[in-house]
Design a protein with these regions (language model features):
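Interdomain hinge and pocket-entrance segments immediately C-terminal to HTH DNA-binding domains
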Residues: 42, 48, 72-91, 105-110, ...
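Central regulatory/effector-binding core of bacterial HTH transcription factors
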Residues: 79-142, 204
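A late-sequence structural motif
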Residues: 94, 249-292
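Hydrophobic hinge/microswitch elements
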Residues: 117-130, 136, 183-250
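Secondary-structure junction motif
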Residues: 136, 165-166, 172, 180-201, ...
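Beta-alpha-beta core module
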Residues: 142-149, 153, 168, 175, ...
């Protein structure tokens, strides 16, 4: 309910009826002798005390999940469910190789993939909803994580084919000073990385931006339509540029801007050894991509 802020939506997400969920919340309020939620006709508002109870509940669930992990790991590694969270600017480009890896190397592993933005992934990891994340490092967030680097990749400048920079072998970063750089909407870590690169080059981009996209596929179509240029991770270039012949790509001169991709887990997880082996196997599966493996 705290996630959906609505009894009907929360009941549907938890596989129960709305009256049953409402009754359970009311019973908890009676047991504690305090109001935890404000009920309105449009949404549920968590009271300040309710937020504190919610924090305690999340810690209890996380501890329960850790206990389940420990029992599962003691039985046999790489068996049972594994909930993997992946950021949207990684999922379409690495999942094909990752899924093949899981099927061949870990046939008894029940992989569940969750594509979400970084803040949601980190919350899910801390709460025990997710086991391991595949995202840009450092992972950040308010809760500690154990980060396992996998590879570094460069960003590539993507332009319309008739752009003055199209066809050049490479460009310096300071070309960004004079370009209309299109960005993803707020909440994507790739947006923050692109903003940092532009600022390092001296470009003063507005935080809000006039044109924003929810995903990389839309972003490159905006570039193809002549609205500006953008920065793409090298792993996304072949997939996204292959959707249209109205794009050109230009490499940045060394040292090229880029990002580091890796795994993030909870510190002290009972499956730490599994995650390390998983990372090593994943590095081997990604060596054919345009990346620099981090051992």
């Amino acid at each position: 309910m705290a996630e959906h802020r609505h009894f009907r939506d929360a009941a549907a997400a938890s596989g129960t009826s709305q009256p049953a969920l409402s009754g359970a919340v009311a019973a908890l309020e009676d047991a504690l002798g305090a109001q935890l939620v404000e009920r309105t006709t449009r949404k549920v508002i968590i009271t300040p005390l309710g937020e504190r109870v919610l924090d305690h509940a999340r810690r209890v669930l996380s501890s329960l999940h850790a206990l389940t992990e420990e029992v599962e790991a003691a039985r046999r590694p790489f068996t049972g469910p594994l909930h993997l969270g992946v950021i949207p600017t990684v999922a379409p480009y690495l999942l094909p190789a990752l899924l093949r890896l899981v099927r061949t190397s870990y046939p008894d592993l029940e992989l569940h993939v969750h594509e979400e933005r970084t803040p949601s992934l980190l919350d899910g990891l801390a709460a025990g909803r997710l086991d391991v994340l595949l995202l840009a490092l450092p992972s950040g967030g308010s809760s500690p994580t154990r980060d396992i680097p996998l590879f570094d990749e460069d960003f590539v400048l993507v332009t319309p084919p008739g752009h003055p920079l199209a066809g050049r072998a490479s460009v310096p970063r300071d070309v960004l000073l004079d370009l209309d750089v299109l960005l993803l909407e707020e909440g994507h870590c790739l947006r923050d990385q692109a903003l940092d690169i532009c600022r390092e080059a001296g470009a003063d981009l507005p935080q809000g931006g006039s044109t924003r996209a929810a995903g990389l596929s839309t972003l490159v179509q905006l570039v193809a339509g002549g609205l500006g240029v953008t920065l793409l991770p090298a792993t996304a270039l072949d997939v996204e540029a292959g959707r249209t012949d109205r794009l050109a790509s230009v490499r940045f001169a060394d040292p090229a801007p880029g990002r580091r991709i890796g795994l993030a887990t909870r510190p002290g997880s009972a499956r730490t050894a599994e995650y390390d082996r998983f990372a090593a196997t994943l590095r081997d599966a990604l060596r054919e991509l345009p990346v620099r493996i981090v051992e």
